[in-house]
Amino acid sequence: MIKTRLLILITAIAGLFFYSCGYKFAGSGELPASVQKVTVLVLENKTAESGIENIITNDIIYEFTRHGKTVAKKDEADAFLYGTVETASDVAISRSSTITSLERRVVVVISLKLKSKDGNIIWTGSNISDDQAFTVLSDKLATENEMRKAIEILSKRLAEKVYNKLTDNF
């Protein structure tokens, strides 16, 4: 009985501590400048990787809707999220010889801005990056498919980073 009360008391104190210091999970805040409805524009692609801008844009839209934020049409939005895929590069991370790679890592860097309807920049996120390893296969087409899968995986993490940075009120 005493142990139960002590456990309840400790839990209550810990809860009050986290509540009082403003602790919250990443991405659980609100969008800046009281933005309620956002239009996510297709990112500009400055890389040689075709279609990467659509993959990342779709994942950002999904991340917003997953958290209950309204993704609106241009004429209904309070703000516009737009930006560029700056780089998409891959490097060898393990080799079987000086010429042959066994595994590579793709790194994608994006930069974004959130602009209000009246044209003011509300938020800027520069050089947001993520990476993902992929296996190099003997068939070039199969290796390209592995890289594409890696881009799809890291795109989801990039979208989470973008959302968390946008809703982080620190």
Model regions and ranges:
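Surface-exposed short loop/turn segments
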Residues: 67-68, 80-127, 131-144
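Residues embedded in well-ordered secondary-structure elements
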Residues: 10, 29, 72, 99-101
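Bacterial N-terminal signal peptides that target proteins for export
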Residues: 1-8
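Bacterial N-terminal signal peptides
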Residues: 8-20
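Soluble non-cytosolic domains of exported or imported proteins
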Residues: 47-58, 101, 105, 141-157
